[in-house]
Amino acid sequence: MHRFVLALVVFAGAAIVWAADDAAHEEGVEWTGKPWMGKWESDPSKDENVEEFKKKLQLPMSHSEMNKNSKVWIHHYKKGDEYHHKIIINDAHYKNDIVFKLGQESAGSYNGSSFSVKYEDKDGALVGSVHYTGTKEQSLDKTINNVFKLEGDHLVKTSTIEGVTMKRHYNKRQ
């Protein structure tokens, strides 16, 4: 009985943490309005050229803990006039919420690495770039061009850096 109660407490605690981190419970959050908005879960079996892309990226943020079967969750939502691009990779212990306004450059950072993003909505796709400038110790000048586009009922992210392109396919989460 003691193990059951302990397991129940751990499960309930994890559920509370997950719910508290979920923007769906925040007032004023919009999950619809653009085809690419919503909660998305990657399907690693459909990924294309991810390992080659990670090699070209050569950043601390390239998530060395990830393997080819690691799932990536993306939450695209709007709060006020700001959009959020939240990335969650549990295998890599990575979580980042990138906040931006369409058509404007926004600064961001993670784990000491600085970057800027600029996204636009073009014909129902989220199109833009992420420019990495590096850390205090290591200056970088790398730009990733991203397109998030709905294909049928799946979101496809196409990313290109220095001539190397990867595709990641996402299924809509409820």
Swiss-Prot record:
Per the record, the domain of life is Eukaryota
Q: What does this protein do?
A: Secreted heat soluble protein acting as a molecular shield in water-deficient condition. Tardigrade-specific intrinsically disordered proteins (TDPs) are essential for desiccation tolerance by forming non-crystalline amorphous solids upon desiccation, and this vitrified state mirrors their protective capabilities.
Region annotated SAHS-c1 sits at 30-60
Q: Which organism is it from?
A: Ramazzottius varieornatus (Water bear)
What's the protein name? Secretory-abundant heat soluble protein 2
Q: Where is the signal peptide?
A: 1-19
Q: Which gene encodes it?
A: SAHS2
Which compartments is it annotated to reside in? Secreted
**Glycoprotein found in the keyword field:** yes
Q: Where is this region: SAHS-c3?
A: 118-172
UniProt keyword terms in alphabetical order: Glycoprotein, Secreted, Signal, Stress response
